[in-house]
């Protein structure tokens, strides 16, 4: 399943964020709302999430062509992106026990969710 949503990592929340919202917190809350609005779903196990991070507008066309589909090896961390997505979808994400996350460069932000079939069938 492909969702045209720009991935946002889960920020470190502070007590002050309850009454004074910082920009990263507001971005994350908007991301959660968009995920719920578009009906994003993820299985409890055997999933592969690909986070497509949009390339900066300042990059040249040559650099964009070189980097499209290549691994994104900068911040945000893939675990914070995955944590943000799981918290947006599930009230209690403790039921999720197996999954994989990848982040790559792309023209626009996307979240691609695939099932990994038969991986744990023999266990």
Segments and roles (model prediction):
Residues 1-123:
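Acidic, proline/glycine-enriched N-terminal capping motif
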